[in-house]
From Swiss-Prot:
Main localization category: cytoplasm
PROSITE patterns, per database record: SHMT
Site note Plays an important role in substrate specificity, residues: H225
Classification via SUPFAM superfamilies: PLP-dependent transferases (SSF53383)
EC top class, as a word: transferase
Protein name as it appears in the record: Serine hydroxymethyltransferase
Annotated organism of origin: Halalkalibacterium halodurans (strain ATCC BAA-125 / DSM 18197 / FERM 7344 / JCM 9153 / C-125)
Amino acid sequence: MSTLQSKDPKVFEAVQQELGRQRDKIELIASENFVSEAVMEAQSSVLTNKYAEGYPGRRYYGGCEYVDIVEDLARDRAKEIFGGEHVNVQPHSGAQANMAVYFTILEHGDTVLGMNLSHGGHLTHGSPVNFSGIQYNFVEYGVDKESQRIDYEEVRRLAKEHQPKMIVAGASAYPREIDFAKFREIADEVGAYLMVDMAHIAGLVAAGLHQNPVPHSHFVTTTTHKTLRGPRGGMIICNEEFAKQIDKSIFPGIQGGPLMHVIAAKAVAFGEALQPEFKSYGEAIIRNAKRLGEKLTSEGIDLVSGGTDNHLLLLDLRSLGLTGKVAEKALDDVGITTNKNTIPFDPESPFVTSGIRIGTAAVTSRGLDEEAMDEIGATIALTLKNVDNEEKMNEARERVDALTAKFPMYPNL
């Protein structure tokens, strides 16, 4: 980055500081990951210069013959990974992928069934502060108060009562496997479309470690980062009968020119996900999450639903007398990055919360193993039990420093 350093030292310095943060801290934010250098090279390529409104073979600009190759590669590889008859890789984000599906099927005011945000859903699944909750009549389902797992009978009851035009499945803070076949069964009973947002678990689906929603859904949306370990972006998978409508909803519906450098990076990441070692990576993510959960439980920290089936753990901090806001700050102070998160039936506000959400996708990419999860779990417990003890906090920092030194990140950058 010598050119950037000489041309704009302030931006260069900020980038280097972020590189240092990623190297020197333990990244446990469940929606984050570390992409390969090949993905970064594709995203920083000359494709950033090319405007390409439209789709391969049907562009509104000339000179698109090479970006067409890239977009076709991304679409074909996504089909090979997930199945599905049609793929659109142009959404700039998961939120825009969801928006495109809504615009394809729904009219203003239509009723939709979506997961309550505080129970693990997502802003775009009907939050009243989001376009989805403003534009449409979302009815919320949640988890059972005792098991803290999705109550499928409640979903069925609500579907029969409200007769939604669409049911949205998928979550941003739900640590258990979701039964997409059951959701489709319920959708069919009331004549609703089923959309699955698999953003968090897409990498696990790609590795064959979570039920694939594509055979059960009318529409599947996802981000291309998180467990899929690609660039930040979105994607839609659907049957051929909806292909033209979906494509039209993206362009010209809600976007103009696609980000061809990002689509190239998506293609590279999808190519990586097709390799045998990606399944090993997914298996390691789940092993690490389970081991970390076991260690935290042994340290007396409560987990929502008692554990995990995927990459994600949701910690209930009420027994420690802490809020998520305090815990996030304390952990960041010792070098562990997390995010405060609501838990089901949370008495605190979303700005404070009673929980934190953690995930193992990034630390697994870094090479950390189950033994390291024991150390991370012990360090989290040490921190959360001693937020006002400077000596113990210093000990936690030293343990983080030892781990990050043992597992270097991006040594060639």
